Amino acid sequence: MKRIAVLTSGGDAPGMNAAIRAVVRKAISEGMEVYGINRGYAGMVDGDIFPLGSKEVGDKISRGGTFLYSARYPEFAQLEGQLAGIEQLKKHGIEGVVVIGGDGSYHGAMRLTEHGFPAVGIPGTIDNDIAGTDYTIGFDTAVNTAVEAIDKLRDTSSSHGRTFVVEVMGRNAGDIALWAGIASGADQIIVPEEEFDIHKVVSTIKDDFENRGKNHHIIVLAEGVMSGEAFAQQLKEAGDESDLRVTNLGHILRGGSPTARDRVIASWMGAHAVELLKEGKGGLAVGIRNEELVESPILGSAEDGALFSLTDEGNIVVNNPHKARLDYAALNRSLAQ
């Protein structure tokens, strides 16, 4: 394989630029040419394809976002869109594609492989909701951004004796809420993987203020459960009388310079994706398990579902067996600040 392309698709994630950089530099070191595709699959169909060299990726490792831009392009799910994209790849002499993104991006990569264009996926999403890898690119940065924000909210919460509901991204997976909540010492964490009793949530708030000597309360809520405003309304209807505020961290979690960890794993996975394409392998997704590079079928990585579930005792059972087990209940209550 002499010429490959790289694209980013779906929601952006800190560390995508580091992955692109690794793809380009590794490919060049292997004597391959690299082309960039702007705006994901939309750019592929439109022919927005151009050569990439070492100069184009210089100083990109520390930048957030993706300099190749990104877009959601549902039309690529249809055969017509796929064939139009493949026509452009052929026109530019491209023999393989590295796709950086989430589950929707992975489905597009699988379609390319089925049409004879080997594609390798790199998990790039802050939600950490791709199976086959312990961590996705951008997750660590998003968690650190969330923790920094929650720490600051705790300052104002304790100054005024308030309850804060902090909404974070996580449509189908509560990983950001879980990890950021634990790291910030949140009093309660509400995730899609666990059903909650609103009356117990209210009771816990009341217990903190009346019996535990606390003058503030922090609840971290994954957006996949419901919006922060809707959750706050349920709290009030269930009898919460605390001075309640809602903060939605929203898209701020996608921005910022990637952490060292995100830069490193993005570099590892980008280089490994090139190695797979050099061997003519497609339909695979690169991942990190136990700090080692692995690959798995790309479609399975996109469709394995939730990465963890919670037992009645509050224990986190990670569906990916290579992830650590954490005691949700113990960390939530005994270590809460």
Swiss-Prot record:
Keywords annotated in UniProt: Allosteric enzyme, ATP-binding, Cytoplasm, Glycolysis, Kinase, Magnesium, Metal-binding, Nucleotide-binding, Transferase
Annotated compartments: Cytoplasm
Binding site for ADP: 21-25, 154, 185-187, 212, 214-216
Catalytic residues in the record: 127 (proton acceptor)
SUPFAM superfamilies assigned to the protein according to its UniProt record, in alphabetical order: Phosphofructokinase
Binding positions for ATP per the UniProt entry: 11, 72-73, 102-105
Regulation: Allosterically activated by ADP and other diphosphonucleosides, and allosterically inhibited by phosphoenolpyruvate.
Chief location of this protein within or outside the cell: cytoplasm
Pathway info: Carbohydrate degradation; glycolysis; D-glyceraldehyde 3-phosphate and glycerone phosphate from D-glucose: step 3/4
Cofactor(s) needed for function: Mg(2+)
One GO biological process term: canonical glycolysis
TM annotation in the entry: none
InterPro entries, A to Z: ATP_PFK, ATP_PFK_prok-type, PFKA_ATP_prok, Phosphofructokinase_CS, Phosphofructokinase_dom, PKF_sf
EC number: 2.7.1.11
Reaction catalysed by this enzyme: beta-D-fructose 6-phosphate + ATP = beta-D-fructose 1,6-bisphosphate + ADP + H(+)
Top-level division of the source organism's lineage: Bacteria
Amino acids binding substrate: 125-127, 162, 169-171, 223, 245, 251-254
Reported function: Catalyzes the phosphorylation of D-fructose 6-phosphate to fructose 1,6-bisphosphate by ATP, the first committing step of glycolysis.
Subunit annotation: Homotetramer.
Name this polypeptide is given: ATP-dependent 6-phosphofructokinase
